[in-house]
């Protein structure tokens, strides 16, 4: 028996092509797409305006299957984190951050991460595999369902109010994994987020965060430009080589040039640089002045992130006064600078704390133990 096709794996064009293979017209694909994403429906029998014969056919050959939630944690500040089973003993984490005027969903793109940034809990777990498009968009599908938002979002779309009154108004690809290392599946999910037959989010409200894979930044600019955030975290190559090892392949000069090129087509007129504040590592006044020189030709804003500790990280958070002074130097240079409010740290849902459950294929744990052995 053939494995059923998971329809969450398709963007609109892909679903139209798949339906064409069944001898069905494009409008049928769009009907099913709306039921899946705008109504949050995973039961073909409930798709009442779809022909009964097609519903019967779909039940035999297709499914609508998001990841399976295995744990639901709610922080004292209202942040909500789901642990989602993606098979073969792997699980990823998705975080919803409610605020007064918006709700942001933080989505994972990989089971683990191979980039091994020094201060990130996900990287310490190693890497297993890329998530499928269904597993990525399924996080938004599932969060809408669990938050009771699917039908509300559909009503907003019908009323022409695309961004008002939604529970999830913003999506950030800032969960587990490096999104641009899983380019094709991430872009399929992004297209669904943007498409009016699915979620209809504004490009300005969808953000991809990258550690700096330069060729993929250029490709994203050409294929699906959304808001871009760059995990910078260092003001010079020597320090960034240590904190963000991908810098050894794509150093800061190349990364800054890629950011300039991206802005030619970006929905926002600036790049967001994320900068984790590590006590005594990258938080000195000299680092701030190096940053000013580094980004002088890149319209940008800085988001300073107080480090969120995790076991055996080896780092400490910069104190509040040091962060305030660091931000002040950037602000005095005319750079918009914010300090991220830590959310969800009591359920390990804060930035840098997501770990999930990863069956490492990189032997990272073995290599780490070997490096710690007394020789």
Swiss-Prot record:
Active site positions, chain numbering: 93 (proton acceptor), 351 (s-methylcysteine intermediate)
Domain Radical SAM core: 99-346
Subcellular location: Cytoplasm
Main localization (coarse): cytoplasm
EC number assigned by the record: 2.1.1.192
Enzyme's top EC category: transferase
Pfam families: Radical_SAM, RlmN_N
Database matches in CDD domains: Radical_SAM (cd01335)
InterPro entries (UniProt xref): Aldolase_TIM (IPR013785), Methyltransferase_A (IPR040072), RlmN_N (IPR048641), RNA_MTrfase_RlmN (IPR027492), rRNA_lsu_MTrfase_RlmN/Cfr (IPR004383), rSAM (IPR007197)
One GO cellular component, as annotated: cytoplasm
Binding site for S-adenosyl-L-methionine: 177-178, 209, 231-233, 308
GO biological process: rRNA base methylation; tRNA methylation
Disulfide bonds: 106-351
GO molecular function: 4 iron, 4 sulfur cluster binding; metal ion binding; rRNA (adenine(2503)-C2-)-methyltransferase activity; rRNA binding; tRNA (adenine(37)-C2)-methyltransferase activity; tRNA binding
Swiss-Prot/TrEMBL catalytic activity: adenosine(2503) in 23S rRNA + 2 reduced [2Fe-2S]-[ferredoxin] + 2 S-adenosyl-L-methionine = 2-methyladenosine(2503) in 23S rRNA + 5'-deoxyadenosine + L-methionine + 2 oxidized [2Fe-2S]-[ferredoxin] + S-adenosyl-L-homocysteine; adenosine(37) in tRNA + 2 reduced [2Fe-2S]-[ferredoxin] + 2 S-adenosyl-L-methionine = 2-methyladenosine(37) in tRNA + 5'-deoxyadenosine + L-methionine + 2 oxidized [2Fe-2S]-[ferredoxin] + S-adenosyl-L-homocysteine
Annotated coiled-coil segments of the chain: none
Alphabetized UniProt keyword annotations: 4Fe-4S, Cytoplasm, Disulfide bond, Iron, Iron-sulfur, Metal-binding, Methyltransferase, rRNA processing, S-adenosyl-L-methionine, Transferase, tRNA processing
Residue positions binding [4Fe-4S] cluster: 113, 117, 120
Needed co-factor(s): [4Fe-4S] cluster
Stated role: Specifically methylates position 2 of adenine 2503 in 23S rRNA and position 2 of adenine 37 in tRNAs. m2A2503 modification seems to play a crucial role in the proofreading step occurring at the peptidyl transferase center and thus would serve to optimize ribosomal fidelity.
Comment field (misc): Reaction proceeds by a ping-pong mechanism involving intermediate methylation of a conserved cysteine residue.
Family: Belongs to the radical SAM superfamily. RlmN family.
Protein name in the entry: Dual-specificity RNA methyltransferase RlmN
Organism whose genome encodes this protein: Azoarcus sp. (strain BH72)
Gene: rlmN
